[in-house]
Design a protein with these regions (language model features):
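A transmembrane helix-and-boundary motif of multi-pass membrane transporters/channels
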Residues: 1-233, 240, 337, 341, ...
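Cytosolic, long alpha-helical scaffolding segments
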Residues: 185-366, 547-725
């Protein structure tokens, strides 16, 4: 009788040898794919097999979708760049001036598009591939055609191996990891709701601490949203899930912004004090919202539907009934109750939309937003143009140094000038240069020590390459802040060991690459310090000044008459960039003079965050036309007051009187409350009007604060201009 195979026992025996953590599994996958790519390149007798191995470690990532997305752009950029460089080489081969000019234009244009294109990596690889073909004209012009042919083949082999390994060898799918992220997003937002409730009703936590928690939560939502872009490259899930997750993350992000606006408003302290003396079922509404979040999460993850209505809907109806009784009896606390009811209504409405999309499966149609996108804004940004020109000049200087020094084989290292110069500040350039050197020395050192102690054959090469790439890849995945060191160590190791024909017989490749890296670093820092120098603090003050101009423009357009309105700027990326600069400067030891400028910059940034929150709140949640009609019925011209608020944000401010504007807005609010009692205006209309007038008052207060504090920007700019910075 045939005995069944002991499958379970065999799997149990192998289990200790199967990597468990996702970092270790990805590292093992990377090591095996690198060795496989190098061996295939040997078998196919490719001229430079290390390009195949390098491609696998450059594409390495924990998640399958990220690898495939990057692989597509790498092969597309390489093909376009290599053949574009070859055809361009035919026109410039006899002119040194055209040789330098073409290299400059290639890098400048590529870096320009790298700054805002969704295909940034493809543009960068295209420039690097074309640069390699063109730069080699000075040394071996007869090789241009073969470089254009074989380089894409060598890189394409690495791409195919990486893609196959990503799908077949320990695949880690983003859509599986995102289920965990979804749970964390729901849990994190529930904790924020509880914290806001405790702070508002019981004052258990400080507002500053609450803001920090909201900022940390916002980062986690952005991280989860970024993962969605790679999910479309994977298999095993419905495409509709991407749309659902995007709606979820966008909605939670928007609600987090509403909470931040509410607790950061100038009226928050008075709202707290007024609510303390009112008897409203606010705790019940908050509890219902938290329960509904948990219910939506469970149904979405399990793909079930119990058909029940949200608890928060009924809780909000009870609150509205209590508000009607309170406002009819006493109008003293109407500002506070309208503010909190407006916030809770936003939360409940968003939850209803999420239930329809995530649980009921309805398609979500996003409202059309007339915004000037990040791409449109950056296309004409002078800083982006300057940055691109500096990158092109860095490459030209590195190329000249290389030609003068006649350093053999250092062309691959010269790519450092491109990779380093795409960084936005000198601080980042210093870090990336140091990491590049450390990685080169570590990986090259391991290879050279192996060659010194072992008489290497093919089997030795496989073992050393497998072990080395695994260690460096695991380091990269585990310690993401220093991932670039591990990547460069892998590249140096592969370049040293994977030479044409088999195991290495010379020590030139790592030394040539090290020399090229030093040339690239030197050239980049010379250009960065000599032309449009931008240390981190200077860059921060400049970006804050630019952010202020964009925000002032947005306020003026938001309050402009409807026929004259223009699209607002989407400033999300600029805010994140400024926040990154602030976090970088907090880690640096600044001298006292710069420290005072930095503290002023932090305060100015906080004002701009509040201004942006106010603009977004009015843009997304307020019906301005209804407010104007309500004011007209009370005998007021709200457009005139809006024009006065907008005038506070004009570039040339004359006779600024924010205090008077604020008093007029308060008088209008009081008049509307009186008119509401006499004319029986609906609670929704009054809520809309009172909250809008509160937002206009907040804009007036912010204008006054920024007018006092922004003088330091002009002072700093004048000092820097006088110093020739």
């Amino acid at each position: 009788m045939r005995q069944p195979l002991p499958t379970a026992e065999a799997l149990a025996w192998f289990k200790p040898f199967i990597p468990q953590s996702k970092e270790n599994r990805a590292a093992v996958r990377t090591a095996i794919s690198a060795v496989a790519a190098v061996l295939l390149a040997f078998a196919l007798h490719l001229d430079k097999p290390y390009w195949s191995g390098m491609t696998t470690v450059i594409l390495a990532n924990i998640y399958t979708g990220s690898i495939i997305d990057k692989a597509i752009m790498r092969i597309a950029g390489t093909l376009a760049g290599a053949w574009g460089g070859y055809f361009l080489a035919g026109y410039i081969a006899n002119s040194f001036l055209l040789y330098l000019l073409s290299a400059f234009l290639l890098v400048t244009i590529a870096v320009y598009y790298y700054n805002f294109s969704v295909y940034a990596y493809a543009y960068l690889l295209g420039a690097i591939s074309a640069f390699i073909v063109i730069a080699d004209l000075a040394i071996a012009p007869e090789q241009a055609f073969w470089v254009a042919v074989w380089r894409p083949i060598e890189i394409g082999l690495g791409v195919l191996v990486s893609a196959a390994a990503a799908f077949c060898l320990f695949p880690i799918n983003i859509h599986e990891a995102l289920d965990k992220e979804v749970g964390q997003v729901f849990t994190g937002f529930q904790q924020l709701i509880r914290a806001v409730q405790d702070n508002l009703l019981l004052r258990h936590s400080a507002v500053d601490e609450l803001r920090k928690n909201m900022q940390a939560f916002k980062k986690s939502v952005v991280k989860a949203t970024d993962m969605l872009g790679y999910m479309r490259r994977e298999v095993g899930f419905k495409r509709e899930k991407i749309d659902q997750l995007r709606v979820l993350f966008d909605s939670i992000y928007s609600l987090n912004r509403s909470l931040h606006f509410f607790i950061s408003s100038q009226q928050y302290a008075s709202i707290q004090a007024e609510l303390k003396t009112t008897d409203l079922p606010l705790a019940e509404v908050f509890s219902a919202i938290i329960e509904d979040l948990d219910c939506i999460k469970c149904h979405f993850l399990k793909q079930t539907d119990d058909g029940k209505e949200l608890n928060s809907t009924q809780a909000l109806h009870s609150l509205d009934a209590a508000l009607s009784v309170l406002t009819a009896r006493n109008s003293q606390h109407q500002q506070a109750v309208f503010a909190i009811s407006h916030l809770l209504r936003q939360l409940v409405n968003k939850l209803q939309s999420l239930q329809l999309v995530l649980v009921k499966g309805q398609k979500f149609t996003a409202p059309h937003a007339r915004l000037i996108s990040r791409k449109q804004r950056l296309q004409t940004d002078p800083d982006i143009i300057k940055h691109s020109i500096k990158a092109g000049l860095s490459v030209i200087l590195a190329l000249c140094f290389w030609l003068i020094s006649n350093w053999p084989g250092g062309l691959n290292g010269l790519i450092s000038s491109i990779v380093i110069s795409i960084r936005k500040s000198i601080y980042e350039m210093k870090n990336i240069s140091l990491y590049r050197l450390l990685g080169c020395l570590t990986g090259g050192g391991l290879a050279l020590c192996s060659l010194a102690w072992i008489r290497m054959d093919l089997y030795d090469l496989i073992i050393i390459l497998l072990f080395g790439v695994w260690v460096f890849s695991y380091f990269s995945f585990k310690y993401t802040a220093y991932a670039y060191i591990g990547l460069q160590a892998n590249i140096a190791l592969i370049i040293t060991l994977a030479q044409a024909g088999g195991p290495p017989i010379a020590l030139d490749p790592p030394l040539e690459r090290l020399g090229g890296i030093l040339i690239g670093i030197t050239s980049t820092f010379l250009v960065a310090n000599a032309l449009w120098r931008s240390d981190t603090l200077t860059q921060l003050t400049g970006r804050l000044h630019k952010l202020s101009r964009y925000l002032h423009y947005n306020v003026r357009q938001l309050l402009a008459p409807e026929p004259q309105k223009k699209p607002l700027y989407d400033l999300t990326s600029l805010f994140w960039f400024c926040r990154g600069l602030l976090e970088t400067l907090e880690q640096e030891g600044l001298p006292p003079k710069k420290l005072s400028v930095f503290e002023e910059a932090k305060q100015d940034f906080q004002n701009q965050v509040l201004l942006q929150a106010t603009i977004t709140h009015v843009y997304e949640y307020i019906n301005q036309d209804k407010c104007r009609l309500a004011a007209a019925r009370a005998g007021w011209d709200l457009r005139a007051l809006e024009a006065e608020v907008a005038a506070l944000f004009e570039e040339k401010q004359v006779n600024l009187k924010p205090g008077q504007v604020k008093k007029q807005l308060e008088a209008l609010r009081d008049a509307l409350l009186v008119a509401a009692e006499e004319e029986n205006v609906s609670a929704d209309d009054m809520e809309n009007s009172v909250v809008y007038l509160g937002s206009l008052m907040q804009l007036a207060i912010i204008a006054e604060v920024m007018a006092r504090n922004n003088q330091w920007v002009d002072d700093v700019n004048q000092e820097q201009a006088a110093a020739g910075v």
